[in-house]
Amino acid sequence: MTNTPQTPPKERANGVIVGACLAFVAGMVGMAYAAVPLYDMFCRVTGYNGTTQRVEQASDVILDEKIKVTFDANVGPGLAWDFKPVQRDIDVRIGETVQVMYRAKNLSSKPATGQATFNVTPMAAGAYFNKVQCFCFTETTLQPGEEMEMPVVFFVDPEIVKPVETKDIKTLTLSYTFYPREPSKPIAAVKDGETENRL
């Protein structure tokens, strides 16, 4: 019989507790990083918090009933832009595909990049507001003094007239806020003087 040293039960228990605590902390850090994209995905799928839907094609059903859509524009701190809708509101037939324009101008003396966030109020209507094309899908860079018109193509889903929460809505507000962003950098940049056809 050999005498092999054994780890006392108390030390083994402490090691398990330390390992569990480290795993818990690592899990919490991972959840913190995943929370924003998961919440964004949840809002886009459900229309929660007035988040609009992104679609590839227009509605094939157009109702005679009309709904008023008003447009709102805001600029977050740190972005010296003038940003506004070209028209304040329109009356559209439910299901009709419509294009409206927003206008942005860089008031600063250097290039500035921004990206727009958006929502629809009343919030219950967000799931029925479908965007086919929108400047909010990508970031926008404006040179000093540059002015740009930016289209939004959308329709209000005819299903909005069915649920109790949305069937009596007569006015929607589409609101955008532009926030400053660092411009995206290309994944692989070619240095000056280098050829692109390297082996």
Curated annotation (Swiss-Prot):
The chain crosses the membrane at residues 13-35. The keyword Membrane applies. The keyword tRNA-binding does not apply. Residues 36-199 are periplasmic. GO terms for molecular function: copper ion binding. Exerts its effect at some terminal stage of cytochrome c oxidase synthesis, probably by being involved in the insertion of the copper B into subunit I. Belongs to the COX11/CtaG family. This is Cytochrome c oxidase assembly protein CtaG. It comes from Sinorhizobium fredii (strain NBRC 101917 / NGR234).
